[in-house]
């Protein structure tokens, strides 16, 4: 499996458009306000406030106002006042806990107008981790389209948003960091769009992204690789020491499967016997 960054290096287009939030913040100075999650929540009238202002209702989600590293760094679900007063982090805020389904969208924008999008249904686990991300055909809700197009006037490029219960909880001026549904043809399409303003609509085959998260980085995880090799599953190992990893859980690896039920079975086997 090849990352978008690796594809762009291979195509000699590494500086054509950013693939991480740090580079996106620097490149798109006119639009990097989108990374301010507190302002984004306020804009949508989602109950929120900076710490140490105390919420009237629990549970809430606490996280950094701006996080350019990703991987849900600093994400915490706070269930009551007693837990809340223990948090002493600067630069954090809280927002209403949303318990609906989460959908992530990769979006193609031309001159402030959305011309294409790709949806992933994300099923959460603990502390900002996920069971899986499954590609599905689902349009962006009209109110979210209007919000994005009002905010991103004249912007041309890519955007990734995370939606729960009709609210944008996070937005990024880049494509999904794991880039698992797109092949080389689609990479060429993205390059042609940015270089020449030409975009071709393409079909995406169904597939699911299965992450494997760990707590103990000193454990020997050879049995995990043995299970994946037994099933002849293609996987990509993450750098568990990267500063972009989460505070509690680290993503050891991920694998992709076009058979959703088989992927769930393999993931269950890994978590049941190895972790």
Range-by-range predicted roles:
Residues 1-13, 171-184, 233-249, 254-257, ...:
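An exposure/low-complexity boundary signal
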Residues 1-42, 258-275:
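ATP-binding N-terminal substructure of ATP-dependent carboxylate-amine bond-forming enzymes
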Residues 16-147:
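Active-site nucleotide/adenylate-binding loops and adjacent lid/helix of ATP-dependent enzymes
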Residues 44, 191-275:
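Peripheral (often C-terminal) accessory segments that flank ATP-dependent C-N-forming ligase machineries
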Residues 47-49, 89-90, 152-156, 231-236:
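Short secondary-structure junctions
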Residues 101-102, 107-155, 167-213:
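ATP-dependent carboxylate/phosphate-activation module, predominantly the ATP-grasp catalytic core
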Residues 162-166:
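A glycine-rich phosphate-binding loop feature that marks nucleotide/adenosyl-phosphate handling sites
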């Amino acid at each position: 499996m090849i990352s978008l960054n690796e594809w762009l290096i291979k195509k000699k287009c590494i500086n054509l458009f950013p693939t991480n939030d740090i580079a996106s913040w620097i490149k798109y100075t006119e639009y990097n306000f989108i990374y301010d999650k507190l302002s984004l929540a306020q804009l949508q009238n989602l109950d929120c406030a900076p710490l140490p202002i105390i919420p009237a209702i629990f549970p809430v989600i606490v996280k950094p106002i701006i996080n350019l590293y990703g991987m849900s760094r600093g994400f915490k679900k706070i269930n009551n006042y007693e837990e809340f007063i223990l948090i002493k982090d600067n630069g954090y805020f809280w927002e209403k806990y949303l318990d609906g389904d989460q959908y992530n969208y990769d979006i193609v924008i031309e001159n402030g107008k959305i011309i294409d999008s790709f949806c992933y249904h994300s099923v959460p686990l603990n502390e900002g981790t996920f069971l899986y991300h499954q590609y599905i055909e689902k349009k962006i809700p009209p109110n979210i389209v209007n919000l994005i197009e009002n905010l991103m006037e004249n912007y041309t490029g890519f955007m990734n948003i995370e939606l729960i219960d009709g609210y944008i909880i996070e937005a990024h001026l880049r494509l999904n960091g794991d880039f698992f549904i797109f092949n080389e043809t689609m990479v060429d399409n993205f390059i042609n769009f940015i270089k020449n303003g030409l975009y071709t609509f393409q079909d995406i085959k169904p597939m699911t992204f299965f992450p494997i998260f760990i707590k103990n980085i000193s454990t020997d995880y050879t049995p995990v690789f043995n299970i994946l090799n037994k099933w002849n599953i293609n996987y990509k190992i993450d750098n568990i020491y990267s500063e972009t990893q989460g505070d509690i859980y680290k993503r050891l690896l991920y694998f992709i499967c076009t058979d959703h039920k088989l992927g769930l079975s393999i993931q269950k086997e890994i978590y049941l016997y190895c972790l």
